[in-house]
Amino acid sequence: MSPEMKAMYKDGDRARKCSYCSEKGHTKRKCEKRTKDIAEYAAENKKYRKAYLDAMVQHGLSIGSLVTPMGARGEKDLGDISPEYIGMVTHIEWKDIQYRRRSNRPIQAKRLGEQENNWNNDMWLGSPPINSKDYESWGRCQVLSRRNDILSHVPADWLDGLSGAEEFF
């Protein structure tokens, strides 16, 4: 071993390199750039989640809401919708509602009508039209029965913007 390497091992600094920023002298856990990036992301994610929750409240979308995929099969109004295309919201994957993942489908609904294929009873709803003036549609879905209890389902630390963000950092 070279004298330089011996000196690094002796001082405990043995070429420590951050896996986040690739700089030497610290680890990912103590990386200042990562800490700053996480704080910036949390601030943006907090704003996004607040707008998302406001849209859910405005739509009356919550666990137990009845929804239908309007437009997915060419329906023009509620009279055209057959019962097998009506579902009830059963689950919201809160940690998947992320500023950097706007195109995901975190809201799960179960179809209510009889199905030919029992394996396909789930409907996954996309993100709300947060900045849209059209609050009658939710992605390509419409809320048929409005509920006002969504706030009781929100996890305690969800609005801080950090939950679920660890996968990005």
Model-derived regions, located:
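Intrinsically disordered, low-complexity linkers and tails
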Residues: M1-K24, R29-F169
